[in-house]
Protein backbone atom coordinates (compact mmCIF):
# COMPACT_ATOMS: atom_id res chain seq x y z
CA UNK A 1 0.00 0.00 0.00
CA UNK A 2 1.20 3.49 -0.81
CA UNK A 3 2.76 5.45 2.06
CA UNK A 4 1.47 9.00 2.60
CA UNK A 5 1.84 11.93 4.98
CA UNK A 6 0.73 15.56 4.96
CA UNK A 7 1.79 18.61 6.95
CA UNK A 8 0.87 22.31 6.91
CA UNK A 9 2.24 25.38 8.68
CA UNK A 10 1.04 28.98 8.92
CA UNK A 11 4.53 30.31 8.16
CA UNK A 12 6.31 33.30 9.70
CA UNK A 13 4.31 36.23 8.29
CA UNK A 14 0.65 35.16 8.20
CA UNK A 15 -1.78 34.94 11.11
CA UNK A 16 -4.21 32.56 9.41
CA UNK A 17 -3.50 29.37 7.49
CA UNK A 18 -5.53 29.47 4.27
CA UNK A 19 -4.02 26.21 2.94
CA UNK A 20 -5.92 22.93 3.22
CA UNK A 21 -4.82 19.41 2.37
CA UNK A 22 -6.19 15.90 2.17
CA UNK A 23 -4.53 12.53 2.67
CA UNK A 24 -7.08 9.76 2.08
CA UNK A 25 -5.50 6.34 1.45
CA UNK A 26 -8.98 4.78 1.54
CA UNK A 27 -10.02 6.81 -1.52
CA UNK A 28 -6.47 6.87 -2.95
CA UNK A 29 -6.92 10.67 -3.02
CA UNK A 30 -4.35 13.30 -2.09
CA UNK A 31 -4.75 17.06 -2.51
CA UNK A 32 -3.45 20.51 -1.61
CA UNK A 33 -5.45 23.75 -1.92
CA UNK A 34 -4.10 27.26 -1.32
CA UNK A 35 -6.94 29.68 -0.67
CA UNK A 36 -7.11 33.40 -1.35
CA UNK A 37 -9.48 36.22 -0.45
CA UNK A 38 -9.95 38.72 2.36
CA UNK A 39 -11.53 38.23 5.80
CA UNK A 40 -10.50 34.55 6.06
CA UNK A 41 -12.34 33.80 2.79
CA UNK A 42 -9.31 31.92 1.45
CA UNK A 43 -9.56 29.47 4.31
CA UNK A 44 -13.25 28.94 3.49
CA UNK A 45 -12.48 28.41 -0.21
CA UNK A 46 -9.70 25.87 0.30
CA UNK A 47 -11.68 23.83 2.83
CA UNK A 48 -14.81 23.92 0.66
CA UNK A 49 -12.83 22.73 -2.35
CA UNK A 50 -11.16 19.88 -0.45
CA UNK A 51 -14.48 18.71 1.01
CA UNK A 52 -16.30 18.84 -2.34
CA UNK A 53 -13.53 17.03 -4.20
CA UNK A 54 -13.29 14.33 -1.53
CA UNK A 55 -17.05 13.77 -1.47
CA UNK A 56 -17.29 13.17 -5.23
CA UNK A 57 -14.17 11.00 -5.45
CA UNK A 58 -15.39 8.83 -2.58
CA UNK A 59 -18.87 8.46 -4.12
CA UNK A 60 -17.62 7.81 -7.65
CA UNK A 61 -15.36 5.07 -6.33
CA UNK A 62 -18.27 3.02 -4.98
CA UNK A 63 -21.50 4.13 -6.73
CA UNK A 64 -22.05 2.64 -10.19
CA UNK A 65 -25.01 4.90 -11.06
CA UNK A 66 -23.42 8.21 -10.10
CA UNK A 67 -24.40 11.32 -12.08
CA UNK A 68 -21.75 13.05 -14.20
CA UNK A 69 -23.08 16.65 -14.48
CA UNK A 70 -20.88 17.52 -17.48
CA UNK A 71 -20.79 14.06 -19.01
CA UNK A 72 -17.59 12.08 -19.58
CA UNK A 73 -14.50 13.16 -21.50
CA UNK A 74 -13.51 10.38 -23.92
CA UNK A 75 -9.92 11.63 -23.90
CA UNK A 76 -9.53 11.02 -20.16
CA UNK A 77 -9.25 7.87 -18.06
CA UNK A 78 -11.87 7.04 -15.44
CA UNK A 79 -9.72 8.66 -12.74
CA UNK A 80 -9.14 11.68 -14.98
CA UNK A 81 -12.90 12.09 -15.38
CA UNK A 82 -13.41 11.70 -11.64
CA UNK A 83 -10.90 14.46 -10.87
CA UNK A 84 -12.21 16.74 -13.62
CA UNK A 85 -15.78 16.44 -12.37
CA UNK A 86 -14.80 16.75 -8.70
CA UNK A 87 -12.87 19.97 -9.27
CA UNK A 88 -15.61 21.42 -11.48
CA UNK A 89 -18.12 20.71 -8.71
CA UNK A 90 -15.78 22.44 -6.25
CA UNK A 91 -15.46 25.38 -8.62
CA UNK A 92 -19.23 25.75 -8.86
CA UNK A 93 -19.65 25.58 -5.10
CA UNK A 94 -16.90 28.10 -4.30
CA UNK A 95 -18.06 30.47 -7.05
CA UNK A 96 -21.66 30.33 -5.85
CA UNK A 97 -20.68 30.91 -2.21
CA UNK A 98 -18.55 33.90 -3.20
CA UNK A 99 -21.43 35.27 -5.28
CA UNK A 100 -24.02 34.82 -2.52
CA UNK A 101 -22.09 36.11 0.50
CA UNK A 102 -20.58 39.58 0.46
CA UNK A 103 -17.83 38.70 2.94
CA UNK A 104 -16.66 35.91 0.61
CA UNK A 105 -16.60 37.99 -2.59
CA UNK A 106 -13.48 37.32 -4.65
CA UNK A 107 -12.45 34.16 -2.83
CA UNK A 108 -10.84 31.27 -4.67
CA UNK A 109 -8.25 28.57 -4.29
CA UNK A 110 -5.56 26.74 -6.19
CA UNK A 111 -5.77 22.97 -6.38
CA UNK A 112 -3.46 20.09 -7.05
CA UNK A 113 -5.18 16.73 -6.55
CA UNK A 114 -4.12 13.20 -7.38
CA UNK A 115 -5.58 9.71 -7.46
CA UNK A 116 -3.27 6.71 -7.31
CA UNK A 117 -4.64 3.50 -8.81
CA UNK A 118 -2.18 0.63 -8.90
CA UNK A 119 0.95 1.95 -10.60
CA UNK A 120 -0.79 4.95 -12.15
CA UNK A 121 -1.11 8.48 -10.76
CA UNK A 122 -3.58 10.96 -12.24
CA UNK A 123 -3.13 14.63 -11.35
CA UNK A 124 -5.44 17.62 -11.80
CA UNK A 125 -4.22 21.15 -11.16
CA UNK A 126 -5.22 24.80 -11.39
CA UNK A 127 -3.12 27.68 -10.10
CA UNK A 128 0.43 27.41 -8.81
CA UNK A 129 0.25 24.53 -6.35
CA UNK A 130 2.54 21.84 -7.73
CA UNK A 131 3.17 18.13 -8.02
CA UNK A 132 6.74 16.84 -8.14
CA UNK A 133 8.24 13.39 -8.67
CA UNK A 134 11.48 12.13 -7.16
CA UNK A 135 12.87 9.11 -9.01
CA UNK A 136 16.42 7.88 -8.62
CA UNK A 137 17.37 11.04 -6.75
CA UNK A 138 16.15 13.27 -9.60
CA UNK A 139 13.41 15.87 -9.01
CA UNK A 140 10.88 16.57 -11.78
CA UNK A 141 7.87 18.91 -11.79
CA UNK A 142 4.82 17.05 -13.15
CA UNK A 143 2.40 20.00 -13.26
CA UNK A 144 2.49 23.33 -15.05
CA UNK A 145 1.91 26.56 -13.13
CA UNK A 146 -1.11 28.60 -14.19
CA UNK A 147 0.62 31.91 -13.50
CA UNK A 148 1.57 35.11 -15.27
CA UNK A 149 5.31 34.42 -15.05
CA UNK A 150 4.91 30.84 -16.30
CA UNK A 151 3.02 32.08 -19.35
CA UNK A 152 5.57 34.86 -19.94
CA UNK A 153 8.38 32.32 -19.65
CA UNK A 154 6.71 30.06 -22.21
CA UNK A 155 6.26 32.96 -24.62
CA UNK A 156 9.87 34.08 -24.24
CA UNK A 157 8.94 37.38 -22.56
CA UNK A 158 10.93 36.37 -19.47
CA UNK A 159 13.89 34.08 -18.97
CA UNK A 160 14.32 31.72 -16.02
CA UNK A 161 16.61 34.17 -14.20
CA UNK A 162 13.85 36.81 -14.15
CA UNK A 163 11.18 34.64 -12.55
CA UNK A 164 12.36 34.26 -8.96
CA UNK A 165 12.17 37.97 -8.09
CA UNK A 166 9.62 39.20 -10.62
CA UNK A 167 6.94 41.46 -9.02
CA UNK A 168 4.17 39.45 -10.70
CA UNK A 169 5.51 36.03 -9.67
CA UNK A 170 2.53 35.40 -7.34
CA UNK A 171 -0.16 36.31 -9.89
CA UNK A 172 -2.07 33.19 -10.93
CA UNK A 173 -4.20 32.97 -14.07
CA UNK A 174 -6.54 30.20 -12.95
CA UNK A 175 -8.23 29.33 -9.65
CA UNK A 176 -11.13 27.29 -8.33
CA UNK A 177 -14.06 29.68 -7.76
CA UNK A 178 -12.63 32.62 -9.69
CA UNK A 179 -15.09 32.17 -12.59
CA UNK A 180 -18.27 30.18 -13.19
CA UNK A 181 -16.33 27.53 -15.14
CA UNK A 182 -12.79 26.18 -15.05
CA UNK A 183 -10.42 24.42 -17.42
CA UNK A 184 -8.05 21.99 -15.76
CA UNK A 185 -4.68 20.53 -16.54
CA UNK A 186 -4.93 16.75 -16.11
CA UNK A 187 -1.93 14.47 -16.55
CA UNK A 188 -1.27 10.79 -15.93
CA UNK A 189 2.02 9.07 -15.15
CA UNK A 190 3.16 5.55 -14.39
CA UNK A 191 4.86 5.12 -11.03
CA UNK A 192 7.86 2.92 -10.40
CA UNK A 193 8.77 1.15 -7.14
CA UNK A 194 10.24 3.62 -4.64
CA UNK A 195 8.96 6.73 -6.45
CA UNK A 196 8.26 9.71 -4.18
CA UNK A 197 5.52 12.18 -5.15
CA UNK A 198 5.11 15.59 -3.52
CA UNK A 199 2.13 17.93 -3.68
CA UNK A 200 2.81 21.41 -2.32
CA UNK A 201 1.57 24.99 -2.13
CA UNK A 202 3.65 27.92 -3.34
CA UNK A 203 4.56 28.62 0.27
CA UNK A 204 7.14 25.89 -0.31
CA UNK A 205 8.37 26.30 -3.89
CA UNK A 206 8.12 30.09 -3.66
CA UNK A 207 10.52 30.15 -0.71
CA UNK A 208 13.03 27.46 -1.67
CA UNK A 209 14.06 26.53 -5.20
CA UNK A 210 13.99 23.12 -6.84
CA UNK A 211 17.66 22.52 -6.07
CA UNK A 212 17.00 22.95 -2.35
CA UNK A 213 13.87 20.79 -2.50
CA UNK A 214 15.89 18.09 -4.27
CA UNK A 215 18.68 18.33 -1.69
CA UNK A 216 16.23 17.88 1.19
CA UNK A 217 14.34 14.99 -0.41
CA UNK A 218 17.52 13.28 -1.60
CA UNK A 219 16.82 9.80 -2.94
CA UNK A 220 13.27 9.99 -1.59
CA UNK A 221 13.77 7.24 0.96
CA UNK A 222 13.67 9.24 4.24
CA UNK A 223 10.68 8.89 6.61
CA UNK A 224 7.91 11.05 5.17
CA UNK A 225 7.22 12.80 8.48
CA UNK A 226 10.87 13.87 8.72
CA UNK A 227 11.10 14.96 5.08
CA UNK A 228 7.96 17.10 5.31
CA UNK A 229 9.19 18.74 8.52
CA UNK A 230 12.56 19.57 6.94
CA UNK A 231 10.90 21.09 3.87
CA UNK A 232 8.63 23.32 5.95
CA UNK A 233 11.50 24.32 8.22
CA UNK A 234 13.57 25.33 5.17
CA UNK A 235 10.69 27.41 3.77
CA UNK A 236 10.27 29.20 7.08
CA UNK A 237 14.00 29.78 7.49
CA UNK A 238 14.01 31.35 4.01
CA UNK A 239 11.44 33.91 5.16
CA UNK A 240 8.20 31.98 5.65
CA UNK A 241 6.22 34.65 3.80
CA UNK A 242 3.26 32.35 3.14
CA UNK A 243 1.44 29.34 4.51
CA UNK A 244 3.28 26.19 3.48
CA UNK A 245 1.79 22.75 2.86
CA UNK A 246 3.39 19.49 1.78
CA UNK A 247 1.83 16.10 1.01
CA UNK A 248 4.25 13.24 0.33
CA UNK A 249 3.39 9.86 -1.22
CA UNK A 250 5.74 6.95 -1.72
CA UNK A 251 5.18 3.93 -3.93
CA UNK A 252 6.32 0.70 -2.22
CA UNK A 253 9.80 -0.39 -3.31
Locate each region found by the language model.
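PP2C/PPM-type serine/threonine phosphatase catalytic domain
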Residues: 1-253
Amino acid sequence: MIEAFGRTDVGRRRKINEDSFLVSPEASLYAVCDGMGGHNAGEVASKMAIETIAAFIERSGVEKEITWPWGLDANLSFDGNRLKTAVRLANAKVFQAADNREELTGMGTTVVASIVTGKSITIASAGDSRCYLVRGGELKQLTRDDSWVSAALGEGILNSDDVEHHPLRNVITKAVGARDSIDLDIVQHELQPGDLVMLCSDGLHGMINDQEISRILGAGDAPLEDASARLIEAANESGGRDNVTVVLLRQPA
